[in-house]
């Protein structure tokens, strides 16, 4: 049913491994490239790549992930190979409407952004997020969606950071939709003014066995 959506976004939380591996799991992920054509076949149009695992395999892993997404025709937002790419909004047109996708993560699990490349991963910073939303509008976006990778894992209520970020974005009148991941469970859906906020979307493809983590949403 994803292919029937006007636009379908995924959160690709894990870096992609070189073709043929080696593959690694928690806590530093490196997953098979085969997942990307499967995502395309399922109907996803774009994936966000800003997460606490973005640089698990360094800048090489980040770059490889974006290269494979490009090769399979999947748009992406949240990490970048160049500063120019970082400053170019991801905008898709569907049924004559231009939709921007922005994405940010809360941190990198103790890793630093790649040396000399502070633009490689989008991290949560409200002034930067607002500037990006404004730039997306200036580039022609009529709808701006923001993905926020944040929260307390397995907790079914949003934390203070999630709420403060959502409030700032919604009140800016630059953003139309805010949705979140990272917590691996479903969290409440709220409305701040005219802006819908889905704080936690749950899981889709995962290996987490608690009942809360298995209660998935796809919107």
Whereabouts are the PLM-identified features?
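Acidic, metal/ion-coordinating pockets
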Residues: 1-219
């Amino acid at each position: 049913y994803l292919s029937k959506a006007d636009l379908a976004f995924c959160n690709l939380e894990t870096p992609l491994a070189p073709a043929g591996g080696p593959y690694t799991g928690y806590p530093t992920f490196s997953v098979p490239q085969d997942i990307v054509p499967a995502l395309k076949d399922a109907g996803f149009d774009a994936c966000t790549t800003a997460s606490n695992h973005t640089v698990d395999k360094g800048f090489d892993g980040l770059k490889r992930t974006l290269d494979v997404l490009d090769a399979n025709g999947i748009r992406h937002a949240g990490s970048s190979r160049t500063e120019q790419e970082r400053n170019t909004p991801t905008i898709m047109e569907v049924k004559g409407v231009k939709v921007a996708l922005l994405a940010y993560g809360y941190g990198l699990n103790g890793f630093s952004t790649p040396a000399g490349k502070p633009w490689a991963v989008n991290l949560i910073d409200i002034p930067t997020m607002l500037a990006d939303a404004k730039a997306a509008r200036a580039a022609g976006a009529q709808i701006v969606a923001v993905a926020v990778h944040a929260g307390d894992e397995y907790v079914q209520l949003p934390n203070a950071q999630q709420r403060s970020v959502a409030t700032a974005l919604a009140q800016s009148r630059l953003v139309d939709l805010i949705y979140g991941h990272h917590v691996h469970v479903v969290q409440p859906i709220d409305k701040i003014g005219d802006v819908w906020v889905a704080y936690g979307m749950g899981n889709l493809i995962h290996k987490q066995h608690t009942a809360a983590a298995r209660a998935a949403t796809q919107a």
